[in-house]
A protein has these predicted regions:
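Conserved catalytic-core motifs of GNAT/GCN5-like acyltransferases
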Residues: 70, 127-129, 144-162, 195-205
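Conserved GNAT acetyl-CoA-binding A-motif
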Residues: 88-90, 115-134
Length: 214
């Protein structure tokens, strides 16, 4: 699991990318998908993409910071679900990274820190496709370990999105329920005022602790 194998942090050199990094972005996204969608060139112009070459000549990871007032698919989906309806803030797009890239948690934490420099934490969101596979569960765990709180599951085209918030006070009292990522009850529990900041593992995979928000 990534949480257990995150080691080679001495090769962590994340930085904001510039237009000259576009060819490297194209190479990474050819296999992983474009972090910011069709507006990647514009995002590079505005220093809105965090990237890491990890001490190599090849871009190993990238993540875009999209404006909530924009027309990206992520921003539209979140606003339609009632998140950031005023158009303020940032939504962090799903990261693109190579299979060999290890410091995922550190990369996510740095992206969160950069977003907080640009706007208040209660205006920062992150979205990630709900993927009930071992890799998808590991990435969800990385988000939670990086300081994000799972707030909702919303539709986007034919898939579902996990919506994380950068600042959500979660009650530390009794757990409402422990569920797996693929449990159909998860969206309903979150809709009823639950949030997830803690997690664990069992034989079936990732276990999310749903608690009431304070």
């Amino acid at each position: 699991m990534l949480l257990m194998t995150e080691t080679n942090l001495d090769v962590f050199h994340a930085q904001l990318l510039v237009p000259q990094d576009a060819p490297a972005m194209d190479q990474l996204c050819a296999a992983c998908g474009t972090p910011g969608g069709p507006d990647t060139a514009a995002l590079l112009q505005t220093n809105a993409v965090l990237g890491d070459y990890a001490g190599t000549d090849t871009l190993q990871a990238a993540m875009a910071m999209l404006p909530m007032f924009g027309q990206s698919r992520l921003a539209l989906a979140l606003r339609a679900a009632g998140f950031g309806a005023d158009g303020q803030g940032i939504v962090l797009a799903p990261p693109a990274f190579t299979a060999q890239y290890l410091p995922v948690r550190r990369f996510l934490a740095m992206a969160l820190g950069l977003a907080k420099q640009r706007c208040a934490s209660y205006h920062i969101w992150a979205a990630l496709p709900l993927t009930p596979t071992p890799d998808g569960e590991e990435l969800c765990a990385q988000y939670l370990a990086s300081g994000f709180t799972l707030r909702a599951v919303v539709p986007l085209d034919s898939q579902q999105l996990l919506v994380f918030a950068a600042h959500t006070p979660v009650g530390r009292g009794s757990t409402v329920r422990r569920v797996h990522l693929q449990d159909p009850a998860l969206p309903r529990l979150l809709e009823r005022g639950g949030a997830v900041a803690d997690f664990g593992w069992d034989k079936q995979g990732l276990v999310l602790s749903v608690r009431r928000m304070e």
